[in-house]
UniProtKB/Swiss-Prot annotation:
Residues in the Extracellular compartment per record: 71-548
Protein name, entry field: LDL receptor repeat-containing protein egg-2
Protein role: Probable receptor which is required for the oocyte-to-zygote transition although its exact function is controversial. Redundantly with egg-1, seems to be required for fertilization probably by promoting the interaction or fusion between sperm and oocyte. Conversely, shown to be dispensable for fertilization but required together with egg-1 for the formation of a continuous and cohesive eggshell chitin layer by maintaining a homogenous distribution of chitin synthase chs-1 at the unfertilized oocyte cell membrane.
Organism for this UniProt entry: Caenorhabditis elegans
Gene giving rise to this polypeptide: egg-2
Cytoplasmic side: 1-49
CDD domains (UniProt xref): LDLa
Any one of the GO BP annotations: positive regulation of protein localization to cell cortex
Length: 548
């Protein structure tokens, strides 16, 4: 454009303001010139087309950005957190002694609350989260105690107050800090007694080696073989500060939060840690979330602190057994209201009395008040030993199971067995009366005495497809004895859980499975519910080490 034309153009602009349409047309021309400078081919298109293309590109970018964020791995991880499928707890480290429950904005958690009994808590939000291992949370009682409980030692960093016997500044105080009364609390190094007067300076100012004196003051004492003067207040606190543990002997009263257990004091960090140290377990009672905190702990409503692995493990660890109520694979009170009579057997597990006294659980042979008269043989008590319940297939098998050998007496030799007239029959190299056939009791180890049966007695189950009679307590045990699986169909809570200790009741399908076979790795329950699926997800996380 010539200078004269340009001046004329400017003069026209000065004289007549552009209309809205002219402004838009002018802007489109400018946009076309900008685009054409980068892409000469754009000059062939009208300005309107250029504007539409640019607008579509901008719109595509606006739509793509949130879509990329949504599909990213981190977004998927956050999305999966809407269903509580793990017990990871990520919390900003807090310095001792703050133990109040942290606010929601301090806590990002994926918890297994949907799988826990309603009256058992994991005390989420309490304790100290190790900086280098977000899935490891230690109780507040182990924070700044002079011992590194986190793998990265973060529990002993940024300490403002120590729970150990001795503390010193992490750095030497400057003169300006001494004069400044408004400065924050200094960071401390926490030391146990064994770090004092050991010839190694653990404090920057060497104060841990400067307190060694030949004579201590009235409120101090010395351990045998040590030059360190320790305060009397650390006696009987459950922590052995002396090598010979003399500071923990002859204790009539415990100090500094320690628990009296017989003649001993249990230190505060071992009280409410989920592991009973007293014979009566009293050190794990009357706990709260401040004391029973940590990634491996669980708190019962009655104040008992237990290990999280003890929840829903088939054993009653809370005082009233609430740690086993409404667990995945169990029946709610509405579906299964009968209270089972449980026996603790020699393997430490708890069994229903029906199962324990059926003769099928060897660990329970000496724990039954009364043996099942139909399915077992009762060995008489000898020398103060309780009656022993053995399964009937062990009778006359040539092996003495009873102390007095009663199970091998009155046995008919096989060569004298009358089998021609079907009065008797043989199996497992023993002779049995014909009345033992098809009676719903396994007298033969190979179970052949219960095959080929046209009828089965009451308190037994008939496999119609196989013509077999099964003992009543084998129904709904998670193992299909019938070829058509009919012995595992339409199971009730009483049949599944009232008779067996190692079974899992599927939430909605009336199907009973062996607990160890429920997940493979996904739930094997027909029409598996969220709880069934979450149980297997929890088990997978636990087996992979991602959850306690």
């Amino acid at each position: 454009m010539s200078q004269q034309a340009g001046n004329a153009q400017r003069g026209r602009f000065d004289e007549e303001p552009m209309s809205l349409g002219e402004k838009i047309s002018h802007r489109m021309d400018q946009l076309k010139e900008i685009v054409s400078s980068s892409c000469p081919c754009a000059g062939k298109f009208p300005p309107v087309a250029i504007v539409l293309i640019v607008a579509l590109i901008i719109l595509g970018v606006i739509i793509a950005v949130p879509l990329v964020i949504f599909l990213s791995p981190s977004a998927q991880a956050m999305s999966s957190g809407t269903r509580d499928l793990s017990s990871h707890s990520i919390r900003h480290p807090k310095v001792w002694p703050k133990t109040e429950k942290v606010q929601d904005d301090d806590l990002s958690a994926i918890q297994m609350t949907s799988l826990l009994p309603p009256n058992v808590s994991t005390c989420s939000g309490f304790g100290f989260a190790c900086t280098g291992s977000i899935d490891m949370i230690i109780p507040s009682s182990k924070r700044c105690d002079g011992l590194k409980d986190c793998s990265d030692g973060s529990d002993e960093e940024n300490c403002k107050e120590c729970q150990s016997i001795y503390s010193c500044r992490a750095h030497i105080e400057e003169e300006s800090e001494k004069k400044d009364k408004t400065s924050v609390l200094p960071t401390l190094i926490c030391l146990t007694a064994e770090k004092l007067c050991n010839g190694v300076e653990n404090c920057p100012d060497g104060s841990d080696e400067a307190s060694c004196r030949s004579k201590c003051s009235k409120d101090q004492f010395k351990c045998s073989g040590s030059d360190a003067c320790l305060p009397i207040s650390v006696k009987c606190d459950g922590v052995s500060d002396c090598e010979n543990e003399s500071d923990e002997s002859n204790c009539n009263k415990c100090q500094k939060g320690a628990h009296k257990c017989g003649k001993n004091c249990i230190k505060a960090s071992k009280v409410c840690d989920g592991i009973p140290d007293c014979d009566d377990g009293s050190d794990e009672h009357q706990c709260d979330c401040k004391t029973c905190s940590g990634s491996e702990k669980a708190l019962c409503e009655d104040g008992t602190c237990i290990m999280r692995s003890q929840v829903c493990d088939g054993k009653h660890d809370c005082l009233d057994g609430i740690d086993e109520e409404n667990c995945p694979g169990s029946c709610s009170n509405e579906r299964f209201s009968s209270k089972l009579k449980l026996l603790t057997c020699d393997d430490g597990n708890q069994y229903s009395e029906v199962e324990a006294c059926s003769g099928l659980v060897e660990a329970c042979e000496l724990n039954c008040p009364k043996c099942d008269p139909k399915h077992t043989f009762t060995c008489p008590a000898v020398g103060g030993i309780h009656n022993k319940c053995i399964k009937r297939s062990k009778v006359c098998d040539g092996i003495f199971d009873c102390e007095d050998g009663a199970d091998e007496k009155k046995c008919t030799p096989v060569k004298e067995c009358v089998v021609e007239s079907s009065i008797q029959f043989t199996c497992d190299n023993k002779c049995l009366e014909s009345s033992r056939r098809c009676d719903g009791v396994w007298d033969c180890e190979d179970k052949s005495d219960e095959k080929g049966c046209d009828k089965c007695p009451s308190r037994s189950f008939k496999c119609s497809a196989d013509k077999k009679c099964l003992p009543f307590h084998t129904r709904c045990n998670g193992v299909a004895e019938c070829s058509d699986g009919s012995d595992e169909h339409k199971c009730s809570c009483q049949e599944c859980l009232g008779t067996h200790h190692d079974t899992y009741m599927c939430s909605e399908s009336n199907r009973c499975l062996k607990r160890g076979e429920v997940c493979s790795p996904y739930s094997m329950c027909p029409n598996a519910t969220y709880i069934d699926k979450a149980y297997c997800a929890s088990l997978a996380l636990k087996n992979s080490g991602l959850r306690p």
